[in-house]
Swiss-Prot record:
TM regions (residue ranges): none
Pathway: Carbohydrate degradation; glycolysis; pyruvate from D-glyceraldehyde 3-phosphate: step 3/5
Entry EC number(s): 5.4.2.11
Keyword Isomerase: yes
Gene Ontology terms: biological process: gluconeogenesis; glycolytic process
Its job: Catalyzes the interconversion of 2-phosphoglycerate and 3-phosphoglycerate.
Native source organism of the sequence: Cutibacterium acnes (strain DSM 16379 / KPA171202)
PROSITE patterns: PG_MUTASE
Highest taxon of the lineage: Bacteria
Gene this chain is encoded by: gpmA
Disulphide linkage map: none
Stated name of the protein: 2,3-bisphosphoglycerate-dependent phosphoglycerate mutase
Site feature Transition state stabilizer, where: H183
Reactions catalysed, as given in the entry: (2R)-2-phosphoglycerate = (2R)-3-phosphoglycerate
Amino acid sequence: MTAKLILLRHGESEWNSKNLFTGWVDVDLNEKGEGEARHAADLLKQENLLPDIVHTSLLRRAIHTAYLALDGCDRHWIPVHRSWRLNERHYGALQGLNKAETKEKYGNDQFMAWRRSYDVRPPDLDRDSEFSQFHDPRYADIPASERPVAECLKDVVARMVPYFTSDIAADLKDGKTVLVAAHGNSLRALVKHLDEISDEDIAGLNIPTGIPLFYELDDNLKPVTRGGRYLDPEAAAAGAKAVANQGNK
């Protein structure tokens, strides 16, 4: 019997539409993003992929997306687990900056290294910055020495994969249909793990907002079909292209 895993990046946020680096800054969905989350629910219903349990981050844009998707599926009553390990990548001192302006200031090579390389972190964010979450009470359980002030994708993999192995995998092995409502980079990290994508090739993977990505997994939780299947392939392709072009004005 195959396990069913649904990955859903949050709908468009207020800062996505402004082309800003968001990271751990807790912005909400905009009107378009709310519509994307409701459309995700329609796609799940059409495929009869009704979640039994949800794993999401501590950020409202992912939590809000999960709520709207579940409400649209009439599954608002199922358990929802929240973990900082599913948070977006912490973009350090880039948080709050416009992507196109950052690219123009630092050049395309540095911009792409910060944005898409596997192991290059952006500059650290000052702990007292208006865009810092270092003193946010929701992260009080993370030891101060481990609380990120900047992350690369490698760091996201290091925090996310243990959560997948310990928590999400247990639900999949119990036969539950699992929805992971998260973020572009935490989902890139998970897809990298599932599909065994190389450190070099992961740079080319872009996750669109609001389109469910469905994986069937075998008894070893390996994908039956590498790359999974988007429930709206055309919209996913267009969305991924838009993500790739975010450094452009």
